[in-house]
Amino acid sequence: MLTYEEHFDKSCELRSEFWQSVGELDPDVIAHLINPSFMGGPVWPSLRQAFATIRRPDVTIIASDGLSDPYEEGDNDYNGLGMEVYVETRPIEGSVQNTWQFQLVYQAAQLMAEQGNVISLLEELTYITTEFYDVDVPFKTERGTVGAILGLPSTSFNNEVTLSLESVKMVNIKLLTLAELDYILQNGDEGRVKVAELLIAQGDATLSTLERPSVI
């Protein structure tokens, strides 16, 4: 039986191998000097909070790196929250840390850590929509939030990766237009599914840009 440290190291290794198969993985992750959980923020499974950058000729991917770490304490029979989240966007030159795309995936990752068992809700509903604060895009709601839909499937790489204890989902976070968000808020489950289907039909379903035409 593997020790916790061996499970942790193996999970990190397998996640890195997965992203290296998708594109060029930046050698350094983005992480805090002081862990936000020490200042009252959400606690990630192994405490470690990091983000990986993956570059392809056509897109840049920014992904959480740690939501699927094995839990440091308690039940270690599964890989953390059973998921990582990512944003896919047009190529970004240099550091991604000060971009709205990073803000989007950062807020999503913190929400996943705070809520805990989001993966079960995704398995039940397929898609989830939510709103985030502190994402610096030109269009926001009157509440100062942006809308996003979680769970649109990638057609260019696998949506799951097998780690040391189980398979975990790589969950896309896609920025919504105000019209799309409003339609979902007005129409509930039916509206969410319709917008998801329209986004898939539009093409580049997992890509987040500010220039994309609204499907509503």
Per-range role (PLM):
Residues 1-63, 67-70, 74-80, 86-216:
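Acidic, proline/glycine-rich low-complexity IDRs
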